[in-house]
A protein has these predicted regions:
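Substrate-binding/catalytic groove segments of enzymes
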Residues: 156-157, 207-218
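Juxtacatalytic substrate-recognition/specificity segment
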Residues: 21-139, 149-158, 165-196, 200, ...
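Acidic helix/loop microenvironments that form the catalytic cleft of cell-wall polysaccharide enzymes
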Residues: 143-151, 214-228
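Specific register positions within alpha-helical solenoid repeats of the TPR/Sel1-like families, i.e.
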Residues: 17, 150, 302, 339, ...
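TPR/TPR-like (Sel1-like) alpha-helical repeat modules
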Residues: 1-6, 13-15, 389-393, 447-464, ...
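Beta/coil-rich, acidic/histidine-enriched accessory regions frequently appended to metallopeptidases
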Residues: 1-10, 21, 32, 36, ...
């Protein structure tokens, strides 16, 4: 009755969107997705979720209530309304409510791509920890376990040490374990929140390394019975005070070992003129380990097309800070040097090393696939296509390269999957795509081959090649019939 009821309006908008959804099922999961998205990457979602079940359920000695429901939204506002009741809420990739997970589709994150696979793995960890503890787990421990398990599943996932975390740790800004819940509540910036996630995951890593997974499971069991977190940690970790001390030592050593000897402070560099190469070089004579100075020098050399000097500077930076996976970090700039010089082999090697450490850099992954394609390294083209698919499954150029390589390699299953994806994304080319699928399936699945041939002819009745294939299938069927 109220035409200005914003809640009702938002819910009606969501209802319209849900009308375009379909449901996919597997032994343990029920996934709701927009129909086209389900056709593109729905089966990989189910496969990944079942893999996470197989890995995590035995580890945490707990089987969640079935089915676990996962909803993936291609519109960020639909995700926000379903999750929070209001649109225009940013900063969340996924949310878990115990039995239900809501997540943003990669289609809603085209401007800021991330690995959607790591997000789903992370959220299923929450399903386990929330249900195992009866929702009595503090946020820091649940988030810590999820990020820790991301890193265990794939070293490219989760959060890793960076120079901001390093500076916070060495600057004595570690939040005591007994107060970690407050780190999420009092975060004043995205950087504060990221550090809360990272520190929490490192507490979990330290607990598992020092006291073992059974001790962590014992803490979760205690939480379920109503024991407070600090009491549970005190009981199973040899005393909370001892855990605090050992963790601080552990995390400090991790920070000291990351880019040891590099100065990440920016105060001193403010004295230099960051746009003047000679001024920066002069600054580095007295501050040779300044990260800001070294990076600025490399950027200016690259800008001035002094590629040999830039290469030397960037190689030094890569050696000093091997864990930097930022998109504007030393490895990415070094790859730019090789790209400008046309040294494709060296560029590919640097990008491959970079992508062995991060699963979120779509631009680098696309470029590496191009380089592998140029070098006729077809196995790597297919491999890189799968990497790209795990970030953004809607990249048509990557799909086409993966398809061509798979066809050449006779990897028919991969090729059919790529063609099926293109059917959803390029429906105007459907007759030809159906025909290509039919050709690939001819020797392994006659029924499906015939089906796709007929679908091609349904949309293009004069498609001569499809008529020829249909006759070939019929002749093969007759030849296979037993003699009477």
């Amino acid at each position: 009755k109220d035409g200005y009821d914003t809640t009702l309006f938002n819910l009606l908008q969501l209802k319209d969107s849900l009308g375009r959804f379909t449901t996919l099922t597997s032994p343990h999961f029920q996934v709701r997705m927009e129909k086209q998205e389900a056709a593109v990457y729905g089966q990989r979602v189910l496969s990944l979720l079942e893999e996470s079940w197989t890995e995590l359920v035995p580890r945490y000695e707990f089987e969640p209530e079935l089915p676990v429901m996962v909803e993936i939204y291609p519109r960020a506002d639909d995700f926000a309304v379903r999750t929070f009741g209001i649109p225009d809420v940013s900063g969340f990739l996924g949310v878990c409510f115990g039995k239900v997970v809501t997540a943003n589709s990669p289609a809603s994150r085209r401007d800021h791509p991330t690995s959607w696979e790591s997000v789903l793995w992370h959220e299923f960890c929450h399903v386990i920890t929330l249900q195992k503890t009866g929702n009595k787990i503090p946020r820091w421990l649940s988030e810590g376990i999820s990020v820790f398990e991301e890193r265990r599943a794939d070293i490219r996932w989760g959060q890793h040490m960076n120079h901001d975390f390093r500076d916070r740790i060495l600057g004595d800004k570690i939040t005591p374990i007994s107060q970690l819940s407050s780190a999420f509540l009092t975060a004043k910036s995205g950087e504060d929140m990221n550090f809360a996630y990272y520190e929490s995951s490192m507490v979990v890593e330290h607990i598992v390394q020092t006291h073992g997974l059974p001790a962590l499971n014992a803490v979760l069991n205690d939480l379920n019975t109503g024991v407070q977190i600090n009491d549970a940690l005190d009981r199973h970790m040899g005393g909370l005070e001892a855990l605090e001390t050992s963790f601080k030592s552990f995390l400090t050593e991790q920070a000291k070992g990351w880019a040891a000897g590099v100065d990440f402070s920016k105060e001193a560099f403010a004295e230099a003129k960051p746009t003047d190469l000679e001024s920066v070089k002069s600054f580095l004579e007295t501050h040779p380990s300044s990260f800001s100075g070294l990076m600025t020098q490399a950027s200016l050399l690259l800008q001035d097309n002094k590629l040999d000097e830039a290469e030397v500077a960037l190689k030094k930076l890569v050696e000093l800070v091997p864990g930097d996976v930022s998109t504007n970090g030393p490895r990415r700039l070094l790859a730019d040097v090789y790209r400008k010089r046309g040294e494709k082999e060296q560029e590919a090697a640097v990008l491959a090393e970079h992508l062995s450490r991060t699963a979120d850099d779509l631009e680098a992954a696309m470029r590496l696939q191009d380089l592998c394609n140029d070098a006729k390294q077809l196995e790597r083209v297919v491999e890189q296509g799968q990497t790209i698919f795990g970030i953004d499954p809607f990249q048509i150029a990557a799909i086409q390269k993966t398809l061509a390589a798979a066809e050449t390699l006779k990897q028919n299953e991969v090729a059919v999957a790529q063609l099926s994806t293109l059917l959803e994304l390029q429906s105007d080319d459907a007759p030809r795509l159906h025909y290509r699928i039919a050709r690939l399936l001819k020797g392994s699945d006659t029924a499906q081959s015939r089906r796709h041939t007929l679908l091609a002819l349904e949309q293009a009745p004069r498609f001569r090649d499809a008529h020829t294939l249909l006759l070939e299938l019929k002749r093969a069927e007759i030849a296979a019939e037993p003699a009477k």
